[in-house]
């Protein structure tokens, strides 16, 4: 996902260059999708750098609040990408987590014949995206597929290795699970490793 975000930004920059604008895209990230302190460090460094604008995707609801406010005080234009900070209102281009979760629920229901047990591997619990993707998936399943039971929900914090371990635990406790919904592609790869 993040590689695609970076590639899309770079492609947009190239298109703007063709129009005569001088645009450079720099992508920086924390060491992992649950490294909230690392992301704050990166954000502070960027706000102290020579950037004309910053687009940010907070890992949690509030880990970047102070860093975003500091960048705003310096007059750096900012926007959100994918997720928002709960405390600072900025323009945003974000995913529709409800729609994504409902599409996943429909797809899974179709694949398992609209009956059976399913489980959820959730991202970082302090991230709105993880909560929305999980809650909307479960709510949609419950409301629309009475013969499908969500038997387990566990956090894996956006981490592939944790997702593999969580999925292994879920499958041992619930051997009749027909599908596992992961909140992101990184965790889905871990779930896939557990299933193999």
Ranges and model annotations:
Residues 1-196:
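A residue-level marker of the well-folded mature domains of exported/periplasmic proteins
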């Amino acid at each position: 996902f993040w590689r695609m975000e970076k590639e899309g930004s770079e492609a947009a920059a190239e298109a703007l260059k063709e129009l005569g604008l001088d645009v450079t895209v720099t992508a920086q990230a924390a060491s992992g999708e649950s490294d909230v302190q690392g992301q704050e460090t990166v954000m502070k460094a960027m706000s102290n750098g020579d950037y004309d604008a910053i687009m940010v995707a907070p890992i949690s609801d509030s880990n970047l609040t102070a860093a975003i406010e500091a960048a705003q005080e310096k007059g750096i234009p900012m926007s959100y990408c994918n997720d928002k900070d709960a405390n600072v209102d900025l323009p945003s281009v974000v995913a529709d987590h409800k729609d994504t979760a409902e599409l996943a629920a429909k797809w899974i229901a179709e694949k398992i014949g609209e009956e059976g047990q399913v489980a959820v591997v959730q991202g970082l619990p302090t991230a709105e995206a993880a909560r929305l993707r999980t809650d909307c998936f479960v709510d949609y399943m419950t409301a629309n597929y009475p013969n499908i039971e969500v038997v387990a929900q566990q956090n894996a914090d956006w981490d592939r290795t944790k997702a593999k371990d969580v999925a292994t635990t879920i499958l041992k406790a619930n051997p009749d699970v027909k599908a596992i919904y992961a909140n992101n592609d990184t965790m889905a790869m871990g779930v896939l490793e557990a299933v193999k």
